[in-house]
């Protein structure tokens, strides 16, 4: 008996021994394998490129995920605003926010001009997005279960230097960037964005901050805000702050920051605060970001 005949007989015997249900399963697996083999040729669907930097400031390798606007390579004469996204790793906020940026940039939506999206991926989020806390720092009761996760906290100063001296120069050197630079962050990332706004405001001229974790270090950044705001330069700037229905601590802190910004901001700073009661800490990112885009880039009037 030829080999293929032997194999055929063996397969038939196997199906008979397995019984009806197992035989169907085996047959289904064979059919699935056959269908898989019959799939037409495909190619990867690529929305961005990942670039690895050896950071001298942080002494570690870091990743940037960068999505270019449609038509970037076809129009070498154009330069583009840059949106820097904190929590910008592939398994963080980059992928879904890339979709939001693409959607907002559509010509029939017009909430955002074509931009370069730069996702700043994390290695130790709680280290990089928190400043050094005072020895008198008292953890909020609702954070007691998470304190061990903050054992490396207090590294925001170095992380801000990384953004200023390595990330921004890298992007400006390798891509056709325009003058506008937006920083987007939520939760701890919004705490960092608030710190940059107050202490290094010239790094960006547009800030989107959602649900900032101002509880950190007994609200010390909130307490420093009046003086820091008074010392800010008068260069034109756009600032958007939002909070959802996230409990009294988060809401009250965000409202307090909004009141301080309104009172002490430089004249050329355009500021918008929104309370979004239908959103919570997990859902606020997309609606608030799209609202910020709409405030920063009003749709031109229809002709």
Language-model segments: which ranges?
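Non-catalytic cap/lid and distal C-terminal segments of serine-dependent acyl enzymes
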Residues: 24-303
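Sec/Tat signal peptide C-region and signal peptidase I cleavage site
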Residues: 19-23
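Bacterial N-terminal signal peptides that target proteins for export
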Residues: 1-9
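Bacterial N-terminal signal peptides
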Residues: 8-18
């Amino acid at each position: 008996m030829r080999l293929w005949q032997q194999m055929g007989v063996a397969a038939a015997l196997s199906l008979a021994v397995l019984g009806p249900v197992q035989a169907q399963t085996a047959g289904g697996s064979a059919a699935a394998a056959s269908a898989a083999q019959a799939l037409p040729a495909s190619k990867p669907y690529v929305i961005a490129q990942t670039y690895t930097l050896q950071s001298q400031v942080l002494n570690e390798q870091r990743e940037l995920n960068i999505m270019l606007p449609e038509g970037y390579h076809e129009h070498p004469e154009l330069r583009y605003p840059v949106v820097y996204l904190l929590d910008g790793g592939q398994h963080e906020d980059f992928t879904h926010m890339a979709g939001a940026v693409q959607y907002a940039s559509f010509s029939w939506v017009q909430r955002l001009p074509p931009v370069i999206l730069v996702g700043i991926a994390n290695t130790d989020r709680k280290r990089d997005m928190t400043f050094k806390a005072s020895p008198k720092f008292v953890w909020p009761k609702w954070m007691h279960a998470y304190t061990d996760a903050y054992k490396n906290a207090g590294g925001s100063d170095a992380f801000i230097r990384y953004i200023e001296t390595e990330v921004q120069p890298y992007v400006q050197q390798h891509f056709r960037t325009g003058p506008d630079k937006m920083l987007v962050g939520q939760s701890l990332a919004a705490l960092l964005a608030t710190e940059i706004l107050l202490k290094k405001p010239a790094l960006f001229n547009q800030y989107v901050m959602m649900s900032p974790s101002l509880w950190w270090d007994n609200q010390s950044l909130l307490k420093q805000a009046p003086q820091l705001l008074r010392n800010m330069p008068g260069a034109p700037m756009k600032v958007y702050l939002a909070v959802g229905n996230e409990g009294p601590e988060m809401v009250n802190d965000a409202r307090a920051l909004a009141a301080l910004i309104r009172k002490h901001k430089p004249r050329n700073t355009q500021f918008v605060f929104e309370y979004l009661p239908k959103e919570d800490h997990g859902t606020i990112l997309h609606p608030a970001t799209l609202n910020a885009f709409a405030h920063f880039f009003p749709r031109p009037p229809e002709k």
